[in-house]
């Protein structure tokens, strides 16, 4: 039996328009700004998971400037979203390597620190392509050129791409 989740209970009313735009497919990037308690990270994690489910050949990369901050921030945020969307039985979350795998398809959400952006050049997935990214704490990155270089390393093919940037 499948349960129905009310997204209105998970996403702040101030972000409903963002969700509607993502759902309609009219945007390929969202930028979420706000302070603590703004629920921007909750929105980002939910949208990333929902998009992953809609694109079975696509994988995702979740990025922070400093790798040691991944586990206590975006990894835990994705774990929360998996649970909130009642998907816990369908995902395997591991910390070494740090990733979330959607068991029915093998799609991966990888968590990457950009302490050394050169490491991204050799990133591979077992099938399909990396088509989604989420830059958390965007203001910690060096600027648009660094973000563009990362996206060029990640988005190397595939028919779909989507970027989430939050700060």
Regions inferred by a protein language model and the residue ranges of each:
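Phosphate/NTP-binding elements of NTP-utilizing enzymes
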Residues: 1-167
């Amino acid at each position: 039996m499948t349960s129905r989740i009310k997204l209105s209970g998970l996403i702040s009313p101030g972000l409903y328009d963002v969700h509607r735009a993502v759902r309609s497919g009219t945007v390929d990037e969202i930028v979420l700004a706000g302070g603590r308690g703004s629920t921007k990270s909750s929105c980002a994690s939910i949208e990333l998971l929902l998009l992953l489910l809609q694109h079975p050949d696509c994988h995702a990369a979740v990025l922070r400037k400093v790798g040691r901050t991944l586990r206590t921030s975006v990894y835990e945020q994705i774990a929360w979203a998996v649970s909130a969307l009642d998907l816990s039985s369908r995902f395997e979350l591991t910390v070494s390597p740090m990733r979330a795998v959607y068991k029915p398809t093998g799609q991966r959400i990888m968590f990457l620190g950009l302490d050394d952006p050169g490491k991204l050049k050799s990133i591979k997935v077992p099938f399909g392509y990396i088509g989604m990214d989420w830059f958390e704490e965007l203001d910690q990155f060096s600027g648009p050129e660094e973000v563009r270089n990362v996206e060029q390393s990640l988005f190397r093919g595939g028919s779909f791409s989507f970027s989430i940037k939050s700060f």
